[in-house]
């Protein structure tokens, strides 16, 4: 049978999601925990392979097993064997045609900036910090130039292995919540470092170095060297993954923490 799981994790101490030799990864820790519950080796497939230091509240995985367990056994059993910075949020039996990556129709990320003169103490590894003034309204205005089907070469990592730079941006909203500026981005898929590269350029708009229209020019230029720097990993969260309704996967609050699903 095939089981889907919702996963939450703090990526600070991991070299990304994907299993690697000799370094800690979220995938490795999860597979070890599930293997103990299943009493056989388990290999998971995920919706999105996050980079080193990136977090997740809405990661989705699936795995196959011939062992019969109640869903609560998978959630409670895995959590009992996982480190404190990784947790299973839900479990559900799914049909064999479900695939955590290939069945997904959209992914959603949030990038959180603590916008204050002084750095944070609590949550220091869960947010990015920018000390100067940021105009979130201009950042939001700039982001609207990226909506729709576009060539995101200007916001694509040089080492990106995707065959196409085209992605469909569904929404990009920038809002302020006290000292926190949140960039909420949803697309059908993302090229490597796309969210962090967009964020780096939006920050340049927010601090007045560039006008909002500059983002439109960057998009049309199709040149990564012209865009802003890649934003730090610690502020980024994979918060949600969309699937066809037929799979009826559980829905949890996407967060992180107190942030509501709808920030508008």
From Swiss-Prot:
Which positions are catalytic residues? 51 (nucleophile)
* Signal sequence coordinates: none
Cite the GO molecular-function annotations of the record.
Answer: RNA binding; tRNA pseudouridine(38-40) synthase activity
Kindly indicate whether the keyword rRNA processing belongs to this entry.
no
InterPro entries linked: PsdUridine_synth_cat_dom_sf, PsdUridine_synth_TruA, PsdUridine_synth_TruA_a/b_dom, PsdUridine_synth_TruA_C, TruA/RsuA/RluB/E/F_N
SUPFAM superfamilies xrefs: Pseudouridine synthase (SSF55120)
What domain of life? Answer: Bacteria
CDD domains, per the entry: PseudoU_synth_EcTruA
Please write the reaction equations for the catalytic activity of this protein.
uridine(38/39/40) in tRNA = pseudouridine(38/39/40) in tRNA
Query: What is an example of a Pfam family matching this protein?
Result: PseudoU_synth_1
State where substrate binds: 109
Keywords noted in UniProt: Isomerase, tRNA processing
* GO terms (BP aspect): tRNA pseudouridine synthesis
Q: What class of enzyme is it?
A: isomerase
Subunit and interaction comment: Homodimer.
Q: Per its database record, what is this protein's job?
A: Formation of pseudouridine at positions 38, 39 and 40 in the anticodon stem and loop of transfer RNAs.
> Mind telling me which NCBIfam families this protein's record contains?
hisT_truA
Q: Which HAMAP family match?
A: TruA
Q: Which family does it belong to?
A: Belongs to the tRNA pseudouridine synthase TruA family.
The entry's protein name is: tRNA pseudouridine synthase A
């Amino acid at each position: 049978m095939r089981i889907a799981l919702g996963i939450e994790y703090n990526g600070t101490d991991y070299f990304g999601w994907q299993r690697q030799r000799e370094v800690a990864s979220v995938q490795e820790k999860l597979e070890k925990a599930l293997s103990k519950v299943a009493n056989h080796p388990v290999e998971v497939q995920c919706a999105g392979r996050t980079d080193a230091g990136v977090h997740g509240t809405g990661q989705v995985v699936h795995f196959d097993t011939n062992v019969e367990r109640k869903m609560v056994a998978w959630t409670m059993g895995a959590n009992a064997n996982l480190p404190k910075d990784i947790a299973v949020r839900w479990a559900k039996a799914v049909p064999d045609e479900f695939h955590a990556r290939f069945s997904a129709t959209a992914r959603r990320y949030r990038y959180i900036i603590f916008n204050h003169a002084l750095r944070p103490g609590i949550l220091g590894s869960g947010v990015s910090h920018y000390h100067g003034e940021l105009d979130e309204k201009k950042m939001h205005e700039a982001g609207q130039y990226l909506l729709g089907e576009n060539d995101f070469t200007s916001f694509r990592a040089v080492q990106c292995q995707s065959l196409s730079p085209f992605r469909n941006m569904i929404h990009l909203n920038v809002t302020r919540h006290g000292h926190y500026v949140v960039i909420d981005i949803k697309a059908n898929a993302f090229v490597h470092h796309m969210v962090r590269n967009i964020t780096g350029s939006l920050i340049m708009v927010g601090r007045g170095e560039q006008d909002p229209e500059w983002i439109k020019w960057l998009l049309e230029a199709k040149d990564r060297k012209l865009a802003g720097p890649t934003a730090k990993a610690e502020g980024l969260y994979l918060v949600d993954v969309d699937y066809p309704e037929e799979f009826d996967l559980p829905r949890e609050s996407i967060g992180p923490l107190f942030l509501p699903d709808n920030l508008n």
